[in-house]
Amino acid sequence: MAELKYTKDGRLLFTKEMRREYKILVPNMLPVHFKLFEKVLQKAGYDLEVLTNSSHRVVEEGLKYVHNDTCYPALLVIGQMIDALNSGKYDVTKTALMITQTGGGCRASNYIHLLRKALKSAGYGNVPVISLNLSGLESNPGFSVTPALVMQFVAGIVYGDMLMLLNNQVKAYELNKGESEALVNSWVERLLEQFSHSKGMLGEDFRNNLKLIADEFDAIPVNRVPKVRVGVVGEIYVKYSPLANNRLEEFLASQDCEVMVPGLMGFTLFKMDNRLDDIVLYGGSSVKYKFVSFLKDFCTKMETAMLDALMEHPNFTVPSPYAHLRTLVNGVIGYGSKMGEGWLLTAEMLELCESGYENIVCTQPFGCLPNHINGKGMIGKIRRVFPNSNITPIDYDPSATKVNQENRIKLMLAVARENLNEKIAAEKAEKAEKNGAVQEEKPAHAS
């Protein structure tokens, strides 16, 4: 059995021996993306599992060990991990936990310390916690993020973004209910099989997969009747995690809406952009600057490959590239606003409005200052740019009830339906007017 080793400041390390013996548990956020990430790490030699437990026990365990005024995502992530350790499914003497650390000023950078504190209180002080980060915040002898691993993660991000995007655009209109979701599951299985054989992550294989995904989704029979189109933005965990947002996408689908959720690639490029800015402004190694620049260029090329595949299909709404999002906030919010989701959150709302998704749910953990500034705080400015924007901020925390959240969203949808009906009526009137003008011209031509 692996020996427990600690750093000078008392942090329990994840050692090379543990890599051979331990199972690593990871909290879930994006179901499709994380299945692909799971395979990437398993292929790299880690016995890793993405958690799927989502009962109310997760919240209860979180409340036991995390103060209820702490960031709601922290409470859920920690609750999910402790609930898993309590389940009896895992040998807790051979289990490690993994959590991401962005290294920014958001409270998310402190989740790892809150998790260690909670583990000690719950009697799991001997469970090591691995920080997944590119900032050099914490290192472990038994875990390393290699350039090859990063590139494979990027491929997973692009595939996940594309499947999420196309599923949302097709399932709202599909004639055979469930066909779009079945295609997502089919592609996840195909990609997992390719990943296990080191295929589909780069080059021609990657581009061919993107083309095939777009082709197959476009082949699903649909009836494109006018529907309310709703964008979902917000704090990254609450925006994406069905556990955190009370299955928001499912609720919007039940209200007969088409949903658009901006992908993870935008956030990835946003973080790289910030790192480059910080090195220029505050100093840093030239090697790190070159590596981040290379990585950003690589991500941009992968993003472009996805957008190119989508542009071949006029039936799909193609999201804007990150470079365009960056230009949208000029005169609205400064680039120095980069805590949490920062100016990207504002940019995503502007881009959604520009793309025809003027009805927006802004998901925010209660008390999340960056989210309130860049999300709720920007609604007024966004309305000046897009007067028809219909944005509702929704707070999520342990005491917020699903009924209240859904009632607020229903009020927003009521306004959205009124706007849609007015638009349809105006289009019909314009069409009738044109037809009338054509009819009047016919006798004149005949003479």
Where do the model's predicted regions map?
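An N-terminal assembly and electron-transfer interface module characteristic of large anaerobic redox
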Residues: 1-447
